[in-house]
Design a protein with these regions (language model features):
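Glycine-rich phosphate/cofactor-binding loops in nucleotide/flavin-utilizing enzymes
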Residues: 227, 339-441
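Terminal amphipathic helices with adjacent charged low-complexity linkers/tails
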Residues: 264-280, 498, 502-505
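A glycine-rich, basic-preceded beta-loop-alpha segment at the flavin cofactor/substrate interface
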Residues: 204-239, 256-273, 297, 418-439, ...
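C-terminal amphipathic alpha-helical interaction region
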Residues: 408-524
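C-terminal helix-coil-helix/basic helical segment that borders enzyme active sites and/or dimer interfaces
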Residues: 8, 290-321, 332-335, 339-340, ...
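Flexible, small-/acidic-enriched active-site or ligand-binding loops
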Residues: 185-211
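A short core secondary-structure module
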Residues: 131-188
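Amphipathic, small/basic residue-rich leader segments at the start of a protein or domain
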Residues: 1-69, 85-89, 93-100, 112, ...
């Protein structure tokens, strides 16, 4: 960390210094998720998150530079889906830093909506290295691609089409991902964006009728058209690692510096930490940081358990980046003039300026809240609905009817139990509910169970009344998602308290967080 001078990086160099680039390559910072047999570190999601968070406490630009190769990109896609030849060719070079990767998904018109990618690859015959072969002619225009200006290998998402039927009867094969060296003829990189003044490399890439062999498709020709599944599976995991790590770093840094500042900075003859207005903001910073760390640990643990928690990672991405923004706002309010004057000793300015980047990327927060959290969770997390849909789609009608009837009866019983449980818990104030622990946090478990029953009941009612229109009722979906999110964040907080041995010093933060979570859930 002592090698990192964020003011010099952002204001003077507009880039990481060469010695820092070399250090990151040499020490394997770009190979955190690459398997050991290819020279990588094979670190867990928790370790990956911890490293990114530590770097971000010093420099957002340095953290993003390390974070991107270890998130969605060539390294992860090759590890999960690459052929043995592709893995042998690329992973050792990526692990050593000889190759710098980027992944191009976002475009000028479609944004990061993978389903609306306009970039296209047409199956055709052409010459490559003096030999005629079957391949793809790619045309693309991408923007906002981190590391694109310096990348040596480009991961590209595009729509694959076979109008002449060279591969079979199917004309539109769907979203496909390919790996292309950036020195390949026709590939254009180098132009830089300026993401709120931060110094990490971010820019555009284009290509027009660039011919590549079919073997350059990640996973080989048999993975043609399977890019959607690849992107969804990898994005759902990565969304819960990198950006939540940046948000948690903001919390830790703000807590450490602002608590100290509030007691050394004097105003009107007394430390500003003695003013109740400042104490109120400090309480929010400390409690929100506790919440951030709790959610970071639980989310990355789920990813390490191979649960692929797409709903949970959407919750983490949205709420943790929003909490990070809240923490930085409070820290800036307390440190005031010190925070707004940029210079080598200003540790708040750059994290504060970069907040909108975390809010925007990997699914803009406003859409994550209104479309993704409950929109995905209503079906994925329901104990009966997904199974009922699968039963209805079965080809054997007799078997389908028997299966559906059994599920429907179970569903009705489930809804009835939730209705009575929610009503009884509400009337009794959750006093007669059960809890897995005793002591100071016992009531929080009971209250969470009451809200969980109420959410389950409201989910069933919403799905019954609105059916398929529920996803389009974004404001309702957002509020239902808020309840689900508060339950998850509250669970993470209680788990961290238990994991840390029920430390009494943590109890004020736990009480603050849980009171806030329960209030927000009730409000939603």
């Amino acid at each position: 960390l002592t090698m990192i001078d964020d003011f010099d990086i952002v204001h003077n160099r507009k880039d990481l210094p060469p010695e820092l680039w070399e250090y990151f390559k040499k020490e394997g910072f770009f190979a955190l998720i690459i398997p050991k047999k290819f020279g990588g570190k094979a670190f867990s999601a928790y370790a990956n998150s911890t490293i990114v968070s530590k770097l971000a406490s010093r420099s957002v630009s340095a953290a993003v530079t390390v974070m991107v190769p270890n998130s969605l990109g060539p390294g992860e896609l090759l590890t999960h889906y690459g052929t043995s030849e592709q893995k042998e060719r690329w992973l050792p070079s990526l692990a050593k830093g000889d190759e710098i990767p980027c992944f191009a998904l976002t475009g000028p018109e479609a944004g990061s909506d993978a389903g609306a990618i306009p970039d296209v690859g047409i199956v055709c015959r052409d010459t490559f290295n003096g030999e005629e072969m079957l391949g793809l002619k790619l045309t693309w225009d991408k923007r906002y691609i981190t590391l694109a200006p310096v990348a040596t290998v480009l991961g590209l998402a595009f729509q694959m089409r076979d109008p002449e039927g060279l591969l079979g009867d199917k004309k539109n094969l769907g979203i496909t991902c390919a790996l292309i060296p950036t020195d390949h003829p026709g590939v254009v990189i180098g132009r830089r964006h300026n993401p709120l003044g931060m110094a990490f490399m971010n820019g555009t890439t284009q290509g027009k009728e660039v011919f590549i062999p079919l073997d350059w498709i990640i996973g080989g020709p048999e993975f043609a058209g399977k890019g959607w599944r690849m992107l969804v599976e990898c994005l759902s995991a990565g969304r819960g690692i990198s950006l939540p790590a940046l948000a948690t770093a903001s919390g830790h840094m703000a807590t450490k510096t602002t608590t100290a500042y509030s007691y050394v900075r004097h105003q009107f003859g007394m430390a500003i930490g003695q003013f109740e207005g400042v104490q109120e903001a400090l309480a929010r910073i400390i409690a929100n940081t506790y919440q951030l760390e709790a959610a970071r640990r639980l989310t990355t643990t789920g990813i390490d358990l191979k649960v692929k928690p797409s709903v949970v990672t959407a919750i983490a991405k949205y709420h943790m980046t929003e909490l990070g923004r809240s923490v930085m706002n409070d820290a800036m309010d307390i440190q005031s003039g010190k925070g707004i004057q940029l210079g080598p000793k200003n540790y708040l300015g750059h994290p504060y300026m970069s907040n909108p980047i975390s809010i925007t990327v990997e699914g803009a927060n406003i859409l994550t809240r209104s479309l993704m959290i409950f929109g995905q969770g209503a079906t994925r997390c329901h104990p009966y609905v997904l199974a009922e849909m699968e039963a209805a789609a079965m080809e054997n009608q007799h078997e389908a009817l028997e299966r559906f009837d059994a599920l429907l009866m179970g569903h009705m019983g489930y809804a009835t139990r939730n209705a009575f449980s929610a009503l009884f818990s509400a009337l009794s104030g959750s006093r007669f509910g059960s809890a897995p622990v005793s002591g100071e946090t016992k009531q929080y478990y009971k209250d969470m169970s009451r809200i969980s029953s109420a959410l389950a009941l409201m989910t069933d009612l919403s799905m019954l009344i609105m059916g398929g229109d529920l996803k389009r009722k974004e404001m309702l979906s957002a509020r239902m998602g808020d309840v689900l999110s508060q339950l998850y964040l509250g669970s993470a907080t209680l788990k961290l308290f238990e994991d840390n041995g029920r430390q009494q010093d943590d109890l004020p933060a736990v009480r603050y967080v849980m009171a806030n979570r329960l209030h927000l859930a009730a409000k939603a």
